[in-house]
Amino acid sequence: MGRLKQCWSSLLVLAVLVIGTGAVPITYLQSAVAKGAVCLDGSAPAYHFDKGFGSGVNNWIVHMEGGGWCTDVASCNERKGTMKGSSKFMNKDFGFSGILGGKQSTNPDFYNWNRIKVRYCDGSSFTGNVEAVNPANKLFFRGARVWRAVVDDLMAKGMKNAQNAILSGCSAGALAAILHCDTFRAILPRTASVKCVSDAGYFIHGKDITGGSYIQSYYSKVVALHGSAKSLPVSCTSKMKPELCFFPQYVVPSMRTPLFVINAAFDSWQIKNVLAPTAVDKGKEWKNCKLDLKKCSAAQLKTVQGFRDQMMRALSPVHSTPSRGLFLDSCHAHCQGGSAASWSGDKGPQVANTRIAKAVGNWFYGRSAFQKIDCPSPTCNPTCPAISTED
């Protein structure tokens, strides 16, 4: 009896520890495989689902995981052996925090919603849709099908009754949230309040240090390889080249669903890959600067400041529309809503004396609008982290 009691005590402690970490088990969507909705390697798509409760039982956050893109067979093949290209390598449990957090103290507006993290394994921001599978490389470019299969599954699990819903994401997942935002709105009940949140997904059609646009050629390869054109918003592709419709600044003007953009003006991923990508930095003069802005020369800092100017212009469709929200800090960071510390913590970034969680919550519920742009230099905001962060 004593041993049984001890066993139950151990299980109780273990349960408390698991609940305390916010670990949410993985769900493999095996039924999607027959529809051809699969990861790069052909494995089933996956997500983590923490059910809502209390007043949040009919409210839903669907959060799209980030993780860059693959532009050719070689880079996509590399992903096949990792969680970025196969659900076989994904961690079985995922700790929810930040915008997905389940604690009222750190996520007061959304803690009891149905919270879903959609895993990213297609390399196309959930836009790929190529029917043919090359027998030589056995790569599947089916991101758009994965997206639809996951949404259909969630609808069957109760999202069809949603009263409030948010489609959000980080980085490449945040771009997906923008690209699929209006479609998400159309799927849900007409009476539901549906909005979208992009965290570090506002990738700009910017110039690099040579005066060219490396990122445009990069996105062109993504769109061509994955057959993304037919999955991008028609309101954009009817006016310009499909690869340009990977840039939010060309998609947002015709979006009908309210959008909140969380971004760093000195986005660390974009400084490294839009402004000073290794491919154009032949002499590696930017190697140290782009990792730590404190190591930039005066001339480099001027160029970095010019990148912020490009960001400001690209964001004009956001701050020119009252229904949209904007939290643009001057941090050297990328994805700031994924941890409790940066989402709502005492030491998290602030703009206009407001933390991200409060800004997004107030905007979603219509308590107050929020379109705030931080001070202009990369060292002006003392609430920014001391070192570059990429959650």
Swiss-Prot record:
It holds the Pfam family PAE. The keyword Isomerase does not apply. One of its GO terms (biological process) is cell wall organization. One of its GO terms (molecular function) is hydrolase activity. This is Pectin acetylesterase 7. InterPro entries: PAE/NOTUM. GO terms for cellular component: extracellular region; plant-type cell wall; plasmodesma. Its EC number is 3.1.1.-. It comes from Arabidopsis thaliana. It comes from the Eukaryota. Keywords: Cell wall, Cell wall biogenesis/degradation, Hydrolase, Secreted, Signal. Hydrolyzes acetyl esters in homogalacturonan regions of pectin. In type I primary cell wall, galacturonic acid residues of pectin can be acetylated at the O-2 and O-3 positions. Decreasing the degree of acetylation of pectin gels in vitro alters their physical properties. It is found in: Secreted, Cell wall. The active site is at S171 (charge relay system), D267 (charge relay system), H334 (charge relay system). Transmembrane segments: none annotated. Residues 1-23 form the signal peptide. The keyword Cell wall biogenesis/degradation applies. Belongs to the pectinacetylesterase family.
